[in-house]
Amino acid sequence: MLGVQKKRSTRKTAARKTVVRKPAAKKTAAKKAPVRKVAAKKTVARKTVAKKTVAARKPVAKKATAKKAPVRKAVAKKTVARKTVAKKTVAARKPVAKKATAKKAPVRKVAAKKTVARKTVAKKTVAARKPVAKKATAKKAPVRKAVAKKTVAKRVASTKKSSVAVKAGVCMKKHKHTAACGRVAASGVKVCASAAKRKMNPNRSRTAHSWRQQLMKLVAR
């Protein structure tokens, strides 16, 4: 417990009756202006207090106490007699005589080379081949048989076909006929020599130039 505890009241708070205080009606009293009385100033005569002359204090004469110088006692130094230690004379080491060991040169054993006796293989003397005598076969000259030429009677194209071709305006060749075919047929030639043969040839290789020319012709039409 720190400090003194405050004593608590023994009265019970429940026993107290709660008194409802009514606010008292304030009386509106007319305030009087306070009249200040001017107090008459009394002239108090000041008495001059006589100053007491305090006797000057005499300085207390200090006693000159002679300071004694501290006397230092000289401590007598003990002279310790040092014993001279006799130095042990170490016997000088004699250098150990090195035994001159003769170094043996490592003897290399030369391996005895075995002389392998090479057997000389007897070369077989191959019998020289005798050139086989070619048989002189008599070449028979090829006998050409004279083929009897058949006298083929040339068929003269009938004038009927040519007249039909002329009327149709085409030649006698089986191909894509052009305007040139009619001119050829009119002249009496049966086979046309126009460019239609080259155009219809399956082995013909087309080039960019030929394609361009063909397109130009188609556009012109």
UniProtKB/Swiss-Prot annotation:
Keyword Repeat recorded: yes
Compositionally biased intervals (Basic residues): 1-50, 59-70
Keywords associated with the record: DNA-binding, Repeat
One GO molecular-function entry: structural constituent of chromatin
Chain positions covered by the region annotation Disordered: 1-70
UniProt cross-references to InterPro entries, sorted A to Z: HC2 (IPR009970)
Pfam families: HC2
Swiss-Prot/TrEMBL GO biological process terms: chromosome condensation
Role played: Might have a role in establishing the nucleoid structure of elementary bodies.
NCBIfam families: histone_lik_HC2
Stated family: Belongs to the histone H1/H5 family. HCT subfamily.
Protein name, per record: Histone H1-like protein HC2
Organism per entry: Chlamydia trachomatis serovar L2 (strain ATCC VR-902B / DSM 19102 / 434/Bu)
Gene: hctB
